[in-house]
């Protein structure tokens, strides 16, 4: 199964939130960039060979909409 995550460029750091849709990961990346004043966040693709991703699209988008 494929999922998307937000990561930090030139760093092993990433946010452990699995997104089913790349568009939702981009919304989260844009939020983090504005919040932190950083431009080095990007989207990575993760492929689960064993197990399933724990998709958090709805939960994260709901939290972001409440924080605006």
Question: Predicted regions: what is each one?
Answer:
Residues 18-22:
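Conserved aromatic
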Residues 1-15, 41-44:
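Short aromatic-glycine-(Arg/Gly/Cys) micro-motifs in beta-strand/loop hairpins
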Residues 25-28:
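Short amphipathic alpha-helices within nucleic acid-binding modules
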Residues 14, 31-68:
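Short, mixed-charge low-complexity intrinsically disordered segments
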């Amino acid at each position: 199964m494929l999922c998307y995550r937000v990561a930090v460029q030139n760093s092993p750091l990433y946010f452990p939130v699995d997104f089913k849709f790349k568009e939702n990961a981009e919304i989260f990346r844009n939020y983090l960039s504005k919040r932190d004043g950083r431009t080095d966040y990007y989207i990575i693709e993760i492929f689960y060979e064993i197990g399933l991703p724990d998709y958090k699209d709805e939960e994260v988008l709901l939290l972001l909409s409440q924080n605006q």
